[in-house]
């Protein structure tokens, strides 16, 4: 029997590039399989998805060699309409997938295009709304829903077409930890009940392995480096060599001396034989320093309308030299809090800077106290050349040209961008663009740098580079605020966690202490790391084991 999806010596080169992105790939996927495709940024994994769903060659043009077939049909001979009946795609950003004004309209969109009879359309919308727990939301606007609800709507919108292949392009990228876990649960449930061929493109390996997959395919530099079971992959060094983060518990077990290469069931912590592993470490706490309050936020309130309060009487302090992680579920008010701190929105309440009420700050004045770096650097960049982008804020402030050059070159050196100072921004990677946006803020000398999801969508290599860079800035005396869904980032790179839930502060404590409070984690849609699960298996103190992990990672980074 022929494979349902088959790449044979398949290569693809974008018209805009000199070298092929995919290089003589030979790969097959059987009908009904559940496959995870992983790889670092720029590896070619997304290009595989684009070739399957028709984005290539219908939107992105290029030259293909070899063959790619789905159900025996040559993909490049099919129209985009024909491909849509073979492959349904759930995009990384659900907001980019919504068509209808209501959830019901959005679900019905594909059926309307297929001229399905009204009676059948209502039946199928009702069926899929029921399967994905959307019955109560059918008359709501998709844009008003939570991150997890949006994901279910976009899923229903493609599942309703009942295509045999379901393709997920980084489905976890914009979700809080619990919503991400629920999404993996949902994908697994749909795979089993709808009997689809399921392909997940992600780099968050541990999160996807929350539910079983049949195979993992590792791609880098346009080639298949591994094609086999998750257990076999975890026994190799391929993840570390190719910039993919392995499960946290596997990293800890390596440090504790477990013979990884000869261990079964590595992909499932519950099934691991840990009889030869133990941990008896204790906690050595650093002497806390007397905090120096930099910002004092008192009774902060904000609402888009009287019926829709977003921030509810928030009060907290930010200390000089701190690394503060702001966490919470999608829609909790984290980004709104950031906008209020930066004076982008009018709020009720008071913000004091070193004891001075700064309510009368202009946006310009506030930006010199708090520099805000957006999640997507492309939304901040407006100039063609790197030097000009970093210099823009100074030029707008009328700074003398000689001072501009001096300050820009200094900050480019700090950000590791000096050698690229004459480059066009278009030649940079995503991570480098992120550094450019940070440099454009740093050059204004703000006391605080506020970053929205600083590592979103980045593989382990770029994640580590970004966080090491932020650590260097912190060592230079900058106070860092990070809005994040990444529990490992919070654990390793912050001193304090502020948990926001429904516009209120649910907790304000050290990250490790937070992980030991399951009720707070549940309310805020956060989750414990697998280090805590491993500690339960080893019958040891999870906080001590977490400290051990952080100490080991610190040693590796030096």
Curated annotation (Swiss-Prot):
SMART domains linked: AAA
Major enzyme class: translocase
EC number: 7.-.-.-
Entry binding sites for ATP 2: 328-335
Highest taxon listed in the record's lineage: Bacteria
Subcellular location: Cell membrane
Keywords: ATP-binding, Cell membrane, Membrane, Nucleotide-binding, Repeat, Translocase, Transport
Main location: membrane
GO cellular component, one term: ATP-binding cassette (ABC) transporter complex
Gene3D superfamilies: P-loop containing nucleotide triphosphate hydrolases
Membrane topology: Peripheral membrane protein
A GO molecular-function descriptor: ATP hydrolysis activity
UniProt: ATP 1 binding residues: 39-46
InterPro entries: AAA+_ATPase, ABC_Co_transporter, ABC_transporter-like_ATP-bd, ABC_transporter-like_CS, ABC_transpr_CbiO/EcfA_su, ECF_ABC_transporter_ATP-bd, P-loop_NTPase
Described function: Probably part of an ABC transporter complex. Responsible for energy coupling to the transport system.
Similarity annotation: Belongs to the ABC transporter superfamily.
Protein name: Putative ABC transporter ATP-binding protein SMU_1934c
UniProt source species: Streptococcus mutans serotype c (strain ATCC 700610 / UA159)
Lineage of producing organism: Bacteria, Bacillati, Bacillota, Bacilli, Lactobacillales
